[in-house]
Amino acid sequence: MPRGEVDMEAQAESALKGSVRLGSYLRRLRVGYGYSLRRVEERAKAEGGEIDNSQLSRYEKGICYPSFDKLRVLASVFNVSVQAFSDVVDLEACEVLKAQGAEPKALVDEGNAAMKAGAYRQAFAYYDFALDQLHSDDSFPNAQDAMTQTRINLAVALSRLGKLALAEQELRHALRASNTLSPTLVARAFLALSNIHADQGDLLLSEVEADKALNLAKAAGLNLLAARALQTLGRVLAQNKEHSAAIDRYREAVTLYETCGEQFETVRVRINVGDCYVALGKMKEGVRLIRSALADARTAGYRRLEAQAWSNLGEAHFRAGETDQAQSCLRQSDALAGSPEKYPDILFFNAYYEWKMAGNQGNPTREKIAFGRLKALRSSLERRLPEVEAFDAFVERRRSDG
């Protein structure tokens, strides 16, 4: 059964009433298209489904859940994925994290701090509440720009949570008014889109969008945004296995980050540079750089980056045939990535290399446990990691052979 169907049915079974968040999302989609309730009913019929306007009204009010078949029809009407609906319901758990009584700017500042701490659900809740306030009261200074800025931040938080379809939708919504937006906001939106498309494996589109963001940032003298665009271009090059060129881009980014006093991204880029050196066969230098970045991430309290650095060290030792060191590093990463907020992509990465090592050592019990973890984590990943693609290919081969 598809993950979206499982999630929606689980939600329907766990509550007698519907989802207020899903209802609000459906209403935003309908209003965004300029559709009346009756018009949605007509479009549903054109898509081969049946949703009368009274049903949709109940869905929007959070009175009841749509069936999975109804969600399929609504997804076609509004040109979104069923997965997006599932993700919206999943995010309902973030409602309890919303702060009360704060101004939008303070909420956004809290969200930014939560992002750096790796608390992505908390960050999402702050941004979402700030966006609600800005929507309900346009008397705030520069309300339109503030709304777009917050929407971009919200999209970045969604992408960190693995909700790529929802994140992309928020960014495309932000860019609808690109003619009236400042170069800073347009560049930020394109850069966020670029990273989402890199996560999805569309490296050509990602490169085009990052280049556009870089040109806008340079023209406006926005060094921090230019650094982020260079970092994304380095990422695209690394994913294309052009590691030497990626290092050059990363170093340009670090130079700009340091002039801006941006420590968090500097640490992230240093991890990536170390990873590139390992990929080039320069193990000693790569490990040195990653360990140096790891120490700074730990000191600064950047839990996500610390977990990432341990994972990259684990992979480096695995490729060098140093199994004990690899396992030790991956365990350190698991401890950080498993709580208080889980990072499924890092946990999957770690489980993949545990699975490979168990197979190499002829340990069927450990291999089976790691494989079970991979299967459990796979359903929560939209991001197209090389390890995800290798695992999917293995599963498909086994299915074909069976």
Language-model region placement:
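Flexible helix-coil transition and linker loops at the boundaries of alpha-helical arrays
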Residues: 94-99, 132-146, 176-184, 217-223, ...
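A short, Lys/Arg-rich alpha-helix, primarily the initiator
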Residues: 2-35
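Structural signature of alpha-solenoid helical repeat junctions
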Residues: 102, 139-146, 183-185, 225, ...
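Tandem amphipathic alpha-helical repeat scaffolds
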Residues: 105-120, 146-162, 185-201, 224-241, ...
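Eukaryotic all-alpha helical interaction scaffolds
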Residues: 114, 134-138, 177-178, 197, ...
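Short alpha-helical DNA-recognition segment
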Residues: 33-59
